[in-house]
């Protein structure tokens, strides 16, 4: 089933390929830092219903797509180089191996 807002996401990029790359890279960042670096507010986070109740959805791709829909993420040219951004994110959100 397609995610809600997929048409809006396609309208934000020049190709399906770019959307795939942007979402995949953001999902990797979210997983690497255990979702601590999300731009979503708690009430905006994707939810998953289980027998025990409602929990944050563990699917990083869903989170990345939802983040992109908020307009709080930027992608494209003339941004901070990826290696510099990665160092800053590691400083702010250390992974378990680094902590």
From Swiss-Prot:
Catalytic activity: RNA(n) + a ribonucleoside 5'-triphosphate = RNA(n+1) + diphosphate
InterPro entries membership: DNA-dir_RNA_pol_omega, Pol_omega/Rpo6/RPB6, RPB6/omega-like_sf
E.C. number(s) listed in UniProt: 2.7.7.6
One Gene Ontology term from the biological process aspect of the record: DNA-templated transcription
GO cellular component, one term: DNA-directed RNA polymerase complex
GO molecular function: DNA binding; DNA-directed RNA polymerase activity
EC class (word): transferase
Sorted UniProt keywords: DNA-directed RNA polymerase, Nucleotidyltransferase, Transcription, Transferase
Signal peptide residue numbers: none
Function: Promotes RNA polymerase assembly. Latches the N- and C-terminal regions of the beta' subunit thereby facilitating its interaction with the beta and alpha subunits.
Subunit text: The RNAP catalytic core consists of 2 alpha, 1 beta, 1 beta' and 1 omega subunit. When a sigma factor is associated with the core the holoenzyme is formed, which can initiate transcription.
Family of the protein in this entry: Belongs to the RNA polymerase subunit omega family.
HAMAP family: RNApol_bact_RpoZ
Record's protein name: DNA-directed RNA polymerase subunit omega
């Amino acid at each position: 089933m397609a995610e809600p807002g997929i048409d809006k996401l396609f309208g934000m990029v020049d190709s399906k390929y770019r959307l795939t790359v942007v979402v995949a890279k953001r999902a990797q960042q979210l997983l690497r830092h255990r979702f601590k670096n999300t731009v979503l507010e708690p009430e905006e986070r994707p939810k998953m219903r289980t027998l025990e109740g409602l929990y944050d959805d563990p699917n990083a791709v869903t989170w990345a797509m939802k983040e992109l829909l908020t307009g709080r993420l930027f992608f494209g040219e003339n941004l901070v180089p990826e290696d510099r951004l990665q160092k800053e994110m590691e400083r702010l959100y250390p992974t378990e191996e680094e902590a």
